[in-house]
A protein has these predicted regions:
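Absolute protein N-terminus
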Residues: 1-2, 115
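Vicinal oxygen chelate
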Residues: 3-11, 57-115
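Core segments of cupin and vicinal oxygen chelate
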Residues: 7-47
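A short beta-turn/loop motif at secondary-structure boundaries
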Residues: 32, 56, 93-96
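Short hydrophobic/aromatic beta-strand element in the GNAT-like acyltransferase core
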Residues: 37, 46, 66, 100-102, ...
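Short, charged/polar, Gly/Pro-enriched secondary-structure boundary elements
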Residues: 44-48, 57, 108-111
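Acetyl-CoA-dependent GNAT
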Residues: 50-54, 115
Length: 115
């Protein structure tokens, strides 16, 4: 059995798609609109992004999506790039056996980057 898709309700679907393409290499599907976008990972998992009202975009405190990296150096590089581009990201640290950091992504959800 293969997980096919996951839907995230976000503040702005297009902005979120462009962010995920730029920093995590997801492939966006052209078309759609600010309210509905689709991205794919390297395994063709479909992540649908649907715009919700600000009061509807609320995730539980522990909810996040994670992007595993091949090395700690890759984690550091993504962290530095996000920081240089003005995102509020904490420095990576050793947690649950991984070199990792969590941050609030555009769209209203948390991303973990780990290696």
């Amino acid at each position: 059995m293969k997980l096919n898709h996951v839907n995230l309700t976000v503040l702005d679907a297009l902005e979120t798609r462009l962010f995920l393409e730029k920093y995590f290499g997801l492939r966006g599907q052209e078309g759609g609109n600010r309210g509905f976008q689709v991205v794919y990972d390297d395994n063709d998992l479909v992540l649908t992004l649907i715009k919700g009202r600000a009061e509807d975009v609320k995730y539980p405190p522990t909810f996040h999506i994670g992007f595993i990296q091949p090395s700690e150096q890759h984690v550091d590089a993504i962290n530095a790039r996000l920081k240089a581009d003005g995102f509020d990201v904490p420095p990576p640290s050793r947690q649950h056996g991984s070199w990792t950091f969590y941050f609030q992504a555009p769209g209203g959800f948390v991303i973990e980057v780990l290696g």
